[in-house]
Amino acid sequence: MELGRAGPAGLLLLLLLLLAAQAAPERDPYRVLGVGRSSSQADIKKAYKRLARQWHPDKNKDPGAEDKFIQISKAYEILSNEEKRANFDRYGDAGESQGYSQHQQRQFHHFHEGFYFDESFFHFPFNSERRDTSDEKYLLHFSHYINEIVPDSFKKPYLIKITSDWCFSCIHIEPVWKEVAQELEALGVGIGVVHAGYERRLAHHLGAHSTPSILGLINGKITFFHSAVVRENLRQFVENLLPGNLVEKITDKNYIRFLSNWKKENKPHVLLFDHMPVVPLLYKLTAFAYRDYLSFGYVYVGLRGTEELSSQYNINVYTPTLMIFKEHIDKPADVAQARDMKKQLIDDFLSQNKFLMAARLTNQRLFQELCPVKKSHRQRKHCVVLLTGEGDKFADAYEAFLTFAVANTKDTLRFAHIYNDRQPEFADALLMDEEKYRGKSAVVILERRNNAGKIAYKTLEEAWQGSNEDNFILLDLLDQLRTDPGLLSSETVLADLNDELAPMFLIRWFYSTLDYILDCWDSLFHSNWREMMPLLSLLFSALFILFGTVIVQAFSDSSDTRDSPASEKKDTTAKTEKNDTSFNKESNSRVPKKGFVEVTELTDINYNSNLVRLRPGHMNVVLILSNSTKTALLQKFALEVYTFTGSSSLHFSFLSLDKHREWLEYLLEFAQDAAPIPNQYDKHFLERDYTGYVLALNGHKKYFCLFKPHRSGDEGGTLGACEDYDSSLHTEARGKSSCSPGSRSLKNKLHKLSFWMERLLEGSLQRFYIPSWPALD
């Protein structure tokens, strides 16, 4: 009896186990991708790409392809994440958090590892497999978005929703989204849905870091929707994406100007007459799609000031009327009228009237569309082109050609004209005898053979004047062409046409700059702050460094001003009385390391170490003195250079003029502006006084800078004044001085040496180069 009772229960349990075992492989990501548990990330990625290409719903029409593709995507999502993969290997579940402790999981894992419960049993809408079927046809993938959606956004705007699984807010906006998507799609707006769980790369590319998100795409530019998700806000958002100058409001005052612009713009002009005060969104979307071919205007027939316009074209004010005007503005070239203007009706109407009756070839794209390359015999199209000029001289020929084009409209014929002076290469290639057609118009019948520019053509033998005879000749050739395509016997290759209507470089640059500024402004206030943080960090860092430098410099200058009196007290009284400006320079120099100046004599013993083999970047400042002036000049020299002793690259020495006069005069020969050096026949040879000269010697680069004592009148002509002084820097009045040593104290010979040292450190002194250092005997 007990066995009988246990029999059905056992069979049910066995059946459940079999079903679970059968479903287990479908839930195992390794089996779904066909890889082993020890496979590397490269192998997993390779397997995913292969299976994704095989089971992609766009390529595989199998009814179960979408479910299989979702399983593949889920499996790759688990195995591509090391943490989820480790959880699955350990617990059979890819979740990041477990409901029980690891001990409990180990205890019960063996029991439940074969059981899988599908949440669809409870009809929860969170599983991607159970998402609304209305979204499935709008699903976007990264390659599809880049290759198709972005280029198509230059023809129509796109409204894109980013969603994910387990998103309660996504469920909340779903009814509104479905209604608006259906409504806007009928008007010509592109609709897209991105599942952030399976298209993480695309979601990141779009800048969507949370779900749900709604964004607009137009001209390749992304704009996020930030208002409440209601029908009116979404419609207004799409309308705001469109440029504001697509449709011009037309009244009795401006309709003639608007329609007459066909010649300047080289486009037909479209007018919509309606009793709605606001331009319909459908009309704006149509204007955006056809903006390269047509110009659009809107007439609100209920507005005062449109009576003349409505009366002239016999408009029914109760029915929307669409009119298209070409070369003649007194009457429309075509009319469409319907109580309910549908997108398909408008598209069919405009696609048949995209070009003027005899459009001017202003760029290569227009030429290729007017005269397409034949793909089959039935699609053969011949272009009749008038090569003419500008001005009243050619007006009659053009009007006659236009009349002929209007009277002979056929699907296989396209009429166009071109200005010879604006497209000289085109005209020269078709008119072999330029002298024959100089100052006249010519007609050419041509057929494009390939996209490389090869054409077959025939030029009318006589110039086009628009006479009846010319019309008969052209009409006869066109009739022959229908039966004998070989009539176009000449062939040539045409270069691409110049773009006559392209804006100037400055205008393009201005608009590009304006768009960039507007994008930055929009990004600053509406973009995700996570993306803006690097830019903001860089900006604030630059501002901090800039203002920090200014503040530190300001405090440094103020502290130097306060400290300068204390520095002056430490120096000698004689220095303070002589030159206050010199002290200001010294206070800003490097702080001396010692309380004295170490000055060594330059002799033949230390000559190599102190000059010839001096380290790169080091200089030896040498004072020239004699035995009689040694004490006074050394004291003054030490006082002048004291503030520069803190520099480790400067060395200080003195040279005895009595011992090494020839060495000094050899160096002075290389000083271009130095005083003439006497020779041995000069009676004043031994009377030249070089005491007080200072030479800054760079032993490594073999050059020196020269300081000469400040001289006055007589001797100044012989020895030369020190050109290294900048009189604009020192405006302190000086008394007249004699060049004779007896008339002026020796200590004044080194006057302003400190300023010369400043310029030496700045590198602004003149340099005198020598081939090699002479020996110091």
From Swiss-Prot:
SUPFAM superfamilies hit by this protein: Chaperone J-domain, Thioredoxin-like
Domain of life: Eukaryota
Alphabetical list of CDD domains matching this protein: DnaJ, TRX_DnaJ
UniProt-annotated stretches for the region Disordered: 558-589
Transmembrane segments: 532-552
Coiled coil: none
A GO biological-process term: regulation of autophagosome size
Topology with respect to the bilayer: Single-pass type IV membrane protein
Signal peptide: 1-23
Subcellular location: Endoplasmic reticulum membrane
Biased composition (Basic and acidic residues): 559-580
Cellular component aspect of the GO annotation: endoplasmic reticulum membrane
Domain Thioredoxin positions: 117-243
Record-annotated disulphide pairs: none
Keywords, comma-separated and alphabetical: Autophagy, Endoplasmic reticulum, Glycoprotein, Membrane, Signal, Transmembrane, Transmembrane helix
Domain J: 28-92
Pfam families with a match to the protein in the record: DnaJ, Thioredoxin
Predominant subcellular localization, coarse grouping: endoplasmic reticulum
UniProt topological domain (Extracellular) ranges: 553-777
Family annotation (Gene3D superfamilies): DnaJ domain, Glutaredoxin
Function: Plays an important role in regulating the size of autophagosomes during the formation process.
Name of this chain's protein: DnaJ homolog subfamily C member 16
Gene: DNAJC16
